[in-house]
Amino acid sequence: MRNKFLNEIVTKPTELGNKIKLMIRPPEIKVEEIEEDENTLSKTHQILKLKAIEGLKFDKTSLEAEAGKPIALIISNPDLLQHNFVLGNPDSMLKLGSAADSIITNPKAIEMNYVPEIDEIIASSKLLDPGTLEIIKLKPLKKGKYPYVCTFPGHWRIMQGYLTVK
C-alpha cells in the first residue's frame, strides 16, 4: 500500500501539489462591516478604498482624488498579517521610509501602531489586525502626489503607493 501511494506522488505531482496547496492555504479572512453607512458618507466625502493584501502589498499602488473636497479613505485588512496606513506630504516617501525603518528601535513602537512621529505625516491608521478596517477622514487636500505606505517593520519598501490629488 505504501509503495502505491509513493508511486502516485511521483506519477501525479500536479495533483499532489494542488492538494498540498489546499491543505496549507488558510481560510479567507472576512473584513468587518463598516459602521458608518457608505451612502451617507459619500454625500460629504469622496470615497476611496484600499486593501492590504497577501504578499505585503496594497491592492492599489495609486489612488486619485479631487482637490478641494473631503476624502473618506476606507482601509481594510483581509490579509493574515497586521498592517497600517500612513499618508505623507508630497515628496516625503524616502523620509517616511527612513522613519519606518528606525521606529523599530523605539520601545513604544507597538503602542504607536508603528507610526513614526514626523511632521511629514498627514494621516495614519491604527495597526489593523486581520479582518479589520478603519475609515480615515481627510480634510480637502491641495493638488499633488501624496505617498502612502505601511510602516509596520519591513513592509514599506514593497507596500506603498501614491494618492494623486488633481
Segments from the language model and where they lie:
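Pro/Ala/Gly-rich low-complexity, hydrophilic intrinsically disordered segments
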Residues: 2-38, 43-44
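Extracellular/periplasmic metallocenter environments
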Residues: 22-38, 81, 110-112, 119-166
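N-terminal edge beta-strand
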Residues: 41-70
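Hydrophobic residues in beta-strands and at strand termini
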Residues: 50-52, 65, 87, 138-140, ...
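Divalent metal-coordination and catalytic microenvironments
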Residues: 73, 85, 150
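Asparagine-centered strand-capping/turn motif at beta-strand->loop junctions
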Residues: 75-77
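Short, hydrophobic/aromatic beta-strand segments
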Residues: 82-88
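The feature marks short-to-medium sequence segments in extracytoplasmic or secretory-pathway proteins
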Residues: 88-118
